[in-house]
Amino acid sequence: MGIKFLEVIKPFCAVLPEIQKPERKIQFREKVLWTAITLFIFLVCCQIPLFGIMSSDSADPFYWMRVILASNRGTLMELGISPIVTSGLIMQLLAGAKIIEVGDTPKDRALFNGAQKLFGMIITIGQAIVYVMTGMYGDPSEMGAGICLVIIIQLFVAGLIVLLLDELLQKGYGLGSGISLFIATNICETIVWKAFSPTTVNTGRGTEFEGAIIALFHLLATRTDKVRALREAFYRQNLPNLMNLIATVFVFAVVIYFQGFRVDLPIKSARYRGQYNTYPIKLFYTSNIPIILQSALVSNLYVISQMLSTRFSGNFLVNLLGTWSDTSTGGPARAYPVGGLCYYFSPPESFGSVLDDPVHASIYIVFMLGSCAFFSKTWIEVSGSSAKDVAKQLKEQQMVMRGHRETSMVHELNRYIPTAAAFGGLCIGGLSVMADFLGAIGSGTGILLAVTIIYQYFEIFVKEQSEMGSMGALLF
């Protein structure tokens, strides 16, 4: 059934825009250039406002997810990477559940990727329609059908640009993937802004600077009681404070420390005697994939809940999914879940919130750990990184595990890989929860994504440097 399903949508995949694979080896400096161009296009789209919107001042239901989804309110990047990640989530789950089957041949993999792109474009249109019809840019009846259609077209074209930019990097023209690049850029930008923002905010305590570090110097310069000024700079509410910044740096250090955890399995050449090597199985075997898929799941739950609560606010089942409240303390207006599944699947605002509602905190912890472990185990089966796939790769390279025959390699790898995937997913979820409870800037999920992505780029750079021999050869 699976192959038949992919064959059915094959004609549609053939008409999709596609980036051709490079016909020659792309030099590192060219990859850096293409990566920079991709990032520049993304950042420009983040600043171009949507044409035709009447207002974007209403409470933002996705304020808490925008850092992770690389989206920017009221701009061409309104949807961010949400459509492409959501399509990936759906396709991976369908493949993992064996509803559709993906063969090992390059043709089947290409067809699967094409189907994922097709669903990404369909989801882009669907999300654009939902955003417009739920009144995020003004009352649709007042804007008129023409303006609504123009906004939907803009969001669709921007979503297509994101898909193609991601494909450009993944095909080998640049470094890493577009999704990772956009997420890391957005999160790092948020952290720097929250630390050094010169924007002033009127609070009950008077006018304060948004940036935590600038606020520290401002409070010390303007307050006569220096001890109280320091206390306020470290613990002020509803605005970034120094404790948030310290928590962010601490989480960065912890995640980098855990990146070094791995098990090295001894392997040897089946052809050349005396040629030994190791195959590393990292603690974060599936890297940041579990947290990206978990974020996609929650963001789509938010979209559905917001859409239904706008139309059927008094319905019992709708309220069971999520009830929302608007808040504008210390920043732009935003909608926050206060009940239902959406509330329990969202992180507590602070450690004090954990003590106030331990049931919420407990359910959130179980959800994060369980979903990350599940997505991690599912991912290895559909991404070509399961024990069977690794054994096949080693066999193709004419390598075998020391002390084991080729036939027993899969059994031996099965002792490590599924465990590393599940436990690594649990650790990813646990670190995200810890960062949320500590109040790290950009959310626990965001910090975790930023660190793992930056570390991936560091590994790419080290690998390229070892192949080229020197820094000068890399760039010149």
Swiss-Prot record:
Residue ranges of the TM segments: 34-53, 77-96, 118-138, 145-165, 173-193, 241-261, 289-309, 355-375, 421-441, 446-462
Cytoplasmic face residues: 2-33, 97-117, 166-172, 262-288, 376-420, 463-476
Principal location class: endoplasmic reticulum
Gene3D superfamilies from the UniProt entry: SecY subunit domain (1.10.3370.10)
Functional summary from the UniProt entry: Component of SEC61 channel-forming translocon complex that mediates transport of signal peptide-containing precursor polypeptides across the endoplasmic reticulum (ER). Forms a ribosome receptor and a gated pore in the ER membrane, both functions required for cotranslational translocation of nascent polypeptides. May cooperate with auxiliary protein SEC62, SEC63 and HSPA5/BiP to enable post-translational transport of small presecretory proteins.
Protein's gene: sec61a
A single GO cellular-component term on record: endoplasmic reticulum membrane
Keywords: Developmental protein, Endoplasmic reticulum, Membrane, Protein transport, Translocation, Transmembrane, Transmembrane helix, Transport
Keyword match Endoplasmic reticulum: yes
Top-level taxon of origin: Eukaryota
Subunit structure: The SEC61 channel-forming translocon complex consists of channel-forming core components SEC61A1, SEC61B and SEC61G and different auxiliary components such as SEC62 and SEC63. The SEC61 channel associates with the multi-pass translocon (MPT) complex.
Cellular compartment(s): Endoplasmic reticulum membrane
Pfam family, one: Plug_translocon
Lumenal side: 54-76, 139-144, 194-240, 310-354, 442-445
Protein name in the entry: Protein transport protein Sec61 subunit alpha
Alphabetized InterPro entries for the sequence: SecY/SEC61-alpha, SecY_CS, SecY_dom_sf, Translocon_Sec61/SecY_plug_dom
The keyword Ligase is assigned to this record: no
BP-aspect Gene Ontology terms: pronephric nephron development; protein targeting to ER; protein transport
Family: Belongs to the SecY/SEC61-alpha family.
